[in-house]
């Protein structure tokens, strides 16, 4: 069995075993490094992730590989650190020699789609690994994740503009500090954060930049405390200009959060820029220390929505253009790309999976039909299964419908223009999700369960006698379930 096929089969079984959310959190960045006789080597971007997988999932992964190939006896997990070198005291990201700027956005009336795709090819081909300071600190940057390769659209345009402003600002913070970007998995948060870091380190003002995942921050601080080296680490972090933290929802532990709170306060009070990303809004990060949550809410929170059809098609076109760099003979008809863009709607990550499936299948099924593509991608299209509804989705859609913000929905404001949408959102959260009254109350600014119960009963009573409101609620249900 080919190595790539083996890894693909094991990955699919692993995702089915642990569930899509756990898989996206811990295994999305797992890659096949090599297969040598009876040993399979996998790679991950951080030491923390390696330790986490070894301690919790190594036996499961070993069993899945052995189920596919009984000759496999051992699984090793490595850390991808090949592009990191140097011995500087401050473990900061160091700028590579700047390449010629390549501007690339979605096609406009003055820029044909073919030209935009060609620019995507140029941007990826020109990308080179970023250099790093010490190998002891900082999560690795992917040189492919730049502003040039980021697909802009209506769902991310505001966040992209804010990110570019920060990358170009130089020393000192911009007005919106911290910048908090949130969305469900697979919509491009990590790409955008790494684009900020990659651009900032090339800034002629020689910015001192640190990009970290929350899991790496936890591991690095725990290691420093264990080795009695915490003061050195703190001093290093105090001297940076830009701190970028990804996957904030994973920041755990009272001591670690206490240290992060001190760092956050120090940087913000010193007018240093902070950029944070998570899978939910800052006020929904219930596991965070309230002081950290409060500080994160003091800046600007921007949400990514799922990409629209035009964005999805552009992502597929660019992915095809890059794949042709490796295999110039690769051809995928435009109608197949358009069909995939119309039907795989959840996230860019699932779109990437659909594209990889197409490329893989065309190697031995060159005449793929649309019907065959539907069979292959049924697990991504949905297979008629009901969509899992989240409270944050309900809040977002209700807020948009009534022209208020999500933050207003969870605030203490009691004006009529806010109270009615809030009660409707609580009602829909109870009827469309399995969440309890207390949990819904926590998601709406820490309200008591009796407040949620009152809202549900109130909306039920109003619906029974108000046809217009009943139609509004049904419309919202359809929008939420789309």
Curated annotation (Swiss-Prot):
Cited InterPro entries: AAA+_ATPase, Chromosome_initiator_DnaA, Chromosome_initiator_DnaA-like, Chromosome_initiator_DnaA_CS, DnaA_C, DnaA_dom, DnaA_N_dom, DnaA_N_sf
UniProt-annotated location(s): Cytoplasm
CDD domains (UniProt xref): AAA, Bac_DnaA_C
Spans annotated as Domain I, interacts with DnaA modulators: 1-71
GO cellular-component term (any): cytoplasm
Pfam family membership, one: Bac_DnaA_C
Positions of region (Domain IV, binds dsDNA): 363-482
Keywords attached to this entry: ATP-binding, Cytoplasm, DNA replication, DNA-binding, Lipid-binding, Nucleotide-binding
Family listed: Belongs to the DnaA family.
Function noted in UniProt: Plays an essential role in the initiation and regulation of chromosomal replication. ATP-DnaA binds to the origin of replication (oriC) to initiate formation of the DNA replication initiation complex once per cell cycle. Binds the DnaA box (a 9 base pair repeat at the origin) and separates the double-stranded (ds)DNA. Forms a right-handed helical filament on oriC DNA; dsDNA binds to the exterior of the filament while single-stranded (ss)DNA is stabiized in the filament's interior.
Cited HAMAP family: DnaA_bact (MF_00377)
PANTHER family from the UniProt entry: CHROMOSOMAL REPLICATION INITIATOR PROTEIN DNAA
Binding partners and assembly: Oligomerizes as a right-handed, spiral filament on DNA at oriC.
Name of this chain's protein: Chromosomal replication initiator protein DnaA
Phylogenetic placement of the source organism: Bacteria, Pseudomonadati, Pseudomonadota, Alphaproteobacteria, Hyphomicrobiales
Gene behind this protein: dnaA
């Amino acid at each position: 069995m080919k190595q790539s096929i083996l890894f693909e089969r094991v990955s699919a079984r692993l995702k089915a075993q642990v569930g899509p959310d756990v898989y996206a959190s811990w295994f999305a960045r797992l890659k096949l490094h090599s297969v040598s006789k009876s040993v399979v080597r996998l790679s991950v971007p951080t030491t923390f992730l390696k330790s986490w997988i070894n301690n919790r999932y190594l036996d499961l992964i070993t069993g899945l590989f052995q189920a596919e190939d009984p000759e496999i006896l051992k699984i090793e997990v490595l850390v991808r650190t090949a592009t990191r070198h140097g011995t500087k005291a401050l473990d900061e990201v160091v700028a590579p020699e700047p390449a010629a700027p390549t501007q690339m956005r979605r096609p406009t009336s003055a820029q044909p789609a073919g030209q935009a795709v060609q620019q995507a090819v140029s941007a990826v081909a020109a990308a080179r690994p970023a250099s790093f300071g010490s190998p002891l600190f900082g999560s690795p940057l992917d040189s492919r994740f730049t502003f040039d390769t980021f697909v802009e659209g209506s769902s991310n345009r505001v966040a992209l503009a804010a990110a570019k402003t920060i990358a170009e600002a130089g020393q000192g913070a911009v007005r919106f500090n911290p910048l908090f970007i949130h969305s469900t998995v697979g919509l491009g948060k990590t790409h955008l954060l790494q684009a900020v870091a990659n651009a900032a380190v090339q800034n002629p003002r020689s910015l001192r930049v640190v990009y970290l995942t929350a899991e790496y921050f936890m591991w690095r601080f725990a290691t420093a405390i264990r080795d009695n080296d915490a003061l050195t680490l703190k001093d290093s972090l105090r001297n940076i200009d830009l701190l970028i933290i990804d996957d904030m929802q994973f920041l755990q532990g009272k001591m670690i959060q206490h240290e992060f709170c001190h760092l956050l306060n120090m940087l913000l009070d010193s007018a240093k820029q902070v950029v944070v990303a998570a899978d939910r809004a800052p006020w929904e990060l219930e596991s965070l220390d309230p002081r950290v949550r409060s500080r994160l809410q003091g800046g600007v929170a921007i949400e990514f929505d799922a990409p629209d059809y035009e964005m999805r098609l552009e992502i597929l076109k660019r992915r095809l253009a890059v794949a042709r760099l490796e295999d110039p003979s690769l051809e995928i008809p435009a109608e197949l790309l358009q069909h995939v863009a119309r039907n795989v709607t959840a996230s860019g990550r699932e779109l990437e999976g659909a594209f990889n499936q197409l490329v893989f299948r065309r190697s031995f099924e060159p005449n793929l039909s649309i019907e065959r593509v539907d069979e292959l991608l049924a697990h991504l299209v949905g297979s008629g299964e009901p969509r899992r509804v989240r409270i944050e989705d309900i809040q977002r859609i209700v807020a948009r419908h009534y022209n208020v913000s999500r933050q207003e929905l969870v605030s203490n404001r009691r004006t009529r223009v806010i109270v009615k949408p809030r009660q409707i959102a609580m009602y829909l959260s109870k009827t469309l999700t399995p969440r309890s009254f207390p949990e819904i109350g926590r998601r709406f600014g820490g309200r008591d369960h009796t407040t949620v119960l009152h809202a549900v009963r109130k909306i039920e009573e109003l619906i029974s006698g108000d046809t217009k409101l009943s139609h509004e609620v049904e419309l919202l249900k359809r929008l939420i379930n789309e």
